[in-house]
From Swiss-Prot:
The gene is mtgA. This is Biosynthetic peptidoglycan transglycosylase. GO terms for molecular function: pentosyltransferase activity; peptidoglycan glycosyltransferase activity. Pfam families: Transgly. Gene3D superfamilies: Biosynthetic peptidoglycan transglycosylase-like. Its EC number is 2.4.99.28. The chain crosses the membrane at residues 12-32. Keywords: Cell inner membrane, Cell membrane, Cell shape, Cell wall biogenesis/degradation, Glycosyltransferase, Membrane, Peptidoglycan synthesis, Transferase, Transmembrane, Transmembrane helix. The keyword Cell inner membrane applies. It catalyses: [GlcNAc-(1->4)-Mur2Ac(oyl-L-Ala-gamma-D-Glu-L-Lys-D-Ala-D-Ala)](n)-di-trans,octa-cis-undecaprenyl diphosphate + beta-D-GlcNAc-(1->4)-Mur2Ac(oyl-L-Ala-gamma-D-Glu-L-Lys-D-Ala-D-Ala)-di-trans,octa-cis-undecaprenyl diphosphate = [GlcNAc-(1->4)-Mur2Ac(oyl-L-Ala-gamma-D-Glu-L-Lys-D-Ala-D-Ala)](n+1)-di-trans,octa-cis-undecaprenyl diphosphate + di-trans,octa-cis-undecaprenyl diphosphate + H(+). HAMAP family: PGT_MtgA (MF_00766). It comes from Azoarcus sp. (strain BH72). GO terms for cellular component: peptidoglycan-based cell wall; plasma membrane. The lineage of its organism: Bacteria, Pseudomonadati, Pseudomonadota, Betaproteobacteria, Rhodocyclales.
Length: 231
């Protein structure tokens, strides 16, 4: 019996050591990306694998552009649509989380996550789309790392360059060229609002952008003037 407990203790210690090493690696990666642009993300690689299962030579559409080459209208539209308290919170919008929980309870199923831009970025960079308590806890840890090490400008820059905007389409530049034939720097308020409202389900909305979504884009456009973004 003592041998069993000894082996169990060693197994737990080894698991803890591996978890700690994983956190150290994550921290080092976040620190590196403070000044270096990520070539891809965990989610981008998952999507590429899925596309290549059907078409082996499939490629993602993705072109990195610096923050100053992204339209101010798109920055404001995304913040207005996804995280209107972005510049003020430290990674978590507790009021938004509470509203999401209440909405999910009314619907009887998860329909709203209440995730901030920082949380979405943490998930996209490192994690899978699966839902579990461990994944949410890890997302929270990475969110804290990002918020502590990066400026809000850097967070929004990376987010706008790696977020999904359609099937195989990632980042503002690829989205602007795919849907409007423009560089991201030249997007106007209307185009920006329409791109912003696609973010919750981009692969669905690129195929079906109906009147309901168009009305939502109009509402976002009306809120853009008050959306605060990093300079």
């Amino acid at each position: 019996m003592k041998t069993l407990w000894r082996w169990l203790g060693r197994a737990l210690l080894a698991a803890f050591a591996l978890l700690l090493l994983w956190q150290v690696w994550l921290f080092a990666q976040v620190a590196w990306w403070r000044t270096h642009n990520p070539d891809s993300t965990s989610f981008m690689r998952l999507r590429l694998d899925a596309l290549q299962e059907k078409k082996p030579d499939a490629r993602l559409r993705h072109t990195w552009v610096p923050y100053e080459q992204i339209s101010i209208h798109l920055k404001r539209a995304v913040v207005a649509a996804e995280d209107d308290g972005f510049v003020d919170h430290e990674g978590f919008d507790w009021d938004g989380i509470q509203r999401a929980l209440e909405k999910n309870e009314r619907k009887g199923r998860p329909v709203s996550g209440g995730s901030t831009i920082s949380q979405q970025l943490a998930k996209n960079l490192f994690l899978s789309p699966s839902r579990s308590y461990f994944r949410k806890a890890q997302e929270a840890v990475i969110t804290v790392m990002i918020e502590q090490l990066w400026s809000k400008r850097r967070i929004l820059e990376v987010y706008l360059n790696v977020v999904e905007w359609g099937n195989g389409i990632f980042g503002a530049e690829a989205a602007a060229r795919r849907y409007y034939g423009l560089p991201a720097s030249r997007l106007g308020p209307a185009e920006a609002a329409r791109l912003a409202v696609m973010l919750p389900n981009p692969r669905k909305y690129e195929r079906s952008f109906g009147p309901r979504l168009a009305a939502h884009a109009d509402r976002i456009r009306g809120r853009m003037a008050w959306a605060e973004v990093p300079p």
